[in-house]
């Protein structure tokens, strides 16, 4: 369960960083 949450977080992190950097 926790692994899937971390996986989803890792997948969404790049887009999140891109949003912050813009």
UniProtKB/Swiss-Prot annotation:
Keywords: Amidation, Antimicrobial, Secreted. Expressed by the skin glands. Belongs to the frog skin active peptide (FSAP) family. Brevinin subfamily. It is found in: Secreted. GO terms for cellular component: extracellular region. Antimicrobial peptide. Its main location: secreted. It comes from the Eukaryota. This is Brevinin-1OKd. The modification Lysine amide is found at residue 22.
């Amino acid at each position: 369960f926790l692994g899937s949450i971390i996986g989803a977080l890792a997948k969404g992190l790049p887009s999140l960083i891109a949003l912050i950097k813009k």
